[in-house]
C-alpha cells in the first residue's frame, strides 16, 4: 500500500478528515514524505496547533496516533530508515520560508500552513509594539487603583489593570471564578479615569450568548459607584456585538467589511471569551484596528480550543511562564507600592509578549476546598490520585456514576429526569414563566458528542420518550413537522437580530395569553421575550447540549455525560470546560477508564 492509499484509508476510518487527505493530494501525489507532512499539518491545525515542530516528525508523532500498528504502517510506506525531514521540506516546491506564497511554510524548524504563518506574523508584529512606560503617570495610576481596590490588598486583578494602562494590547486569562467579569468593569473604569480626551469603548465576544452576558454586567450601578459627574462625560459605549458583527463579516461570502484599508474607529476594544477566537480571526481583528486602539482580550486559555482552527490564546499565554521584564516589574512595584512583588524575571527575548499577559489565579467563586475547585484543578494538572476519591464519591458536591451496562444507562436517565422534578412542578402549578426559566437553568445536561447513545441527539430523544411514557407531559403537538409540548426547552443555534434572540440562548415552551404555543426567553433586566413557535428558526431541543455550546455559560448544577468509547474528541480541555460550567454541583456519567484516558490526553 502506498502513502496515498494509506491516507485515504485513514480518512475512511475517520482517523483524519477527507479535507486532510485531499490537501495532501493537492500538495503532492508522488512524494510520500511531503504527502504525510501536509496531511499532518492540516490535521493538527484543526486540533489547535499553530505549527508543527520538526521533532513531531522525527519522533513519529503522526496525527497524534498512539496506536503502534498505524505508526508502523506509515513508516513502512515511507520506506526509509532515516529521513532528513528538514531537507525534504526545503527542497520541495510546495514549501517556502514565507517570502513568497507557498501552501506550506518551513520557518525556524516549524512547519505551518501559509495562511496560519501569515496570521501569526501579523499578530507578533502587533505584540512587538513597545509598552507606554514614558506616558504613564504613576501617581494617577496609584489613585485609580486605590479607588478600585483596597489599599492593603495585593492581587493579580491590580496587575491586570496596570498592564492594561501601560500596554495597547493585553491578554487577561484565568479559570472560572477568578474575577474575569469584575476585571472587565474595573478596566473600563480605570481607562475612563485615565483618559485625556473623550473615548469610544466597544465590547465584543465571539457568540451572541457571550454578548448577552456582557450586556448583563454592564450597568449604570457600577459607573455611578466609581465615576464622578465630569468623568461620565468622558466616554461613550458602542452597542455590544459579536466579533462577526463588529468586523462586518458576510455570512455568505465571509468577506470582511472592516480591514486594514477600512479601520474601525474606536479607542478601546474589550473582547470576552477570547479562548473561542482562532488565529485567523485574531489576525482579522488586529488588521481592522488602528495602532492607537487599545485592545484587551479576556478568557480562559485552558478551555476548549476554537472550533475552526488553531488556538491562539493558549499559544500566547504560554509565554506568561517566561516572566516579566525588569522594567515592567519596576513599574508594577512603583504603582502598587508593593516591594514584595517578585515575579520571575524574563531572561529570554520574549518579554515583548510576556509583559502583555496577566494570569488571574485566585478563585473568588470557589473556596479552595470545594469539590468543583478540587476536581477542576486535578483535571487541569492531571492529578490522577484525586480521581480515586472521585470514583468513591468522596469529593464534596461531585457525584460519579459508572455507566457500564444497560441497567446503569437506564439509571442515568432516571436520575436526570428526577433532577427536573422542581421544573415540572412549577409548570403544573402555572408559576410565572420567569421563575420557570430560572428553575430550568439551575440544572443542565452536557454531552461531549452529538451522536450515539451518549450524544445530545439520542439523550434528548430518549428523555422526551421517557417523560411522555411517565405522563410528565401528556399533550404533544406537531407543528412544521416538529414535536412540541409545554415545557420543551430549546437552544438557539444562530443569531436572529429581527427576533432579538442569539446563538446559545435557551427558551422554554409555554402557552401565550391567546392559548397558542410560544417560546419565552429571559433577557436583560428580567425582561421576557416571547416568540411564537411558527416563526422560530435555527434551534434544537436543549434538555442536553454539547459542552461546546455551553462554553461561556454557567449553571448551578451540571450532569456531564461522557461517551463509552475513547473517541478523538475526548481530551483534557473539553472535560475541564464541562466541569467548570457548574457553580455548585456536578454529576459525572462515564466509565472510570474513559474518564482517566480523557484527562491524560492534551
Curated annotation (Swiss-Prot):
Keyword vocabulary terms for this entry: ATP-binding, DNA damage, DNA repair, DNA-binding, Exonuclease, Helicase, Hydrolase, Isomerase, Nuclease, Nucleotide-binding
Gene Ontology cellular component terms for the protein in this record: exodeoxyribonuclease V complex
Keyword Nucleotide-binding listed: yes
Annotated positions binding ATP: 174-181
InterPro entries on file: AAA+_ATPase (IPR003593), Coronavir_polyprotein_1ab (IPR050534), Helicase_ATP-bd (IPR014001), P-loop_NTPase (IPR027417), RecD (IPR006344), RecD_N (IPR049550), RecD_N_sf (IPR041851), UvrD-like_helicase_C (IPR027785)
GO biological process, one term: double-strand break repair via homologous recombination
EC number assigned by the record: 5.6.2.3
PROSITE patterns: HELICASE_ATP_BIND_1
Reaction(s) catalysed (UniProt annotation): Couples ATP hydrolysis with the unwinding of duplex DNA at the replication fork by translocating in the 5'-3' direction. This creates two antiparallel DNA single strands (ssDNA). The leading ssDNA polymer is the template for DNA polymerase III holoenzyme which synthesizes a continuous strand; ATP + H2O = ADP + phosphate + H(+)
Family annotation (Gene3D superfamilies): P-loop containing nucleotide triphosphate hydrolases, RecBCD complex, subunit RecD, N-terminal domain
GO molecular function: 5'-3' DNA helicase activity; ATP binding; ATP hydrolysis activity; DNA binding; exodeoxyribonuclease V activity
Family listed: Belongs to the RecD family.
HAMAP family per record: RecD
Function: A helicase/nuclease that prepares dsDNA breaks (DSB) for recombinational DNA repair. Binds to DSBs and unwinds DNA via a highly rapid and processive ATP-dependent bidirectional helicase activity. Unwinds dsDNA until it encounters a Chi (crossover hotspot instigator) sequence from the 3' direction. Cuts ssDNA a few nucleotides 3' to the Chi site. The properties and activities of the enzyme are changed at Chi. The Chi-altered holoenzyme produces a long 3'-ssDNA overhang and facilitates RecA-binding to the ssDNA for homologous DNA recombination and repair.
Oligomeric form and interacting partners: Heterotrimer of RecB, RecC and RecD. All subunits contribute to DNA-binding.
Further remark: In the RecBCD complex, RecB has a slow 3'-5' helicase, an exonuclease activity and loads RecA onto ssDNA, RecD has a fast 5'-3' helicase activity, while RecC stimulates the ATPase and processivity of the RecB helicase and contributes to recognition of the Chi site.
Protein name, entry field: RecBCD enzyme subunit RecD
Organism field: Buchnera aphidicola subsp. Schizaphis graminum (strain Sg)
Name of the gene: recD
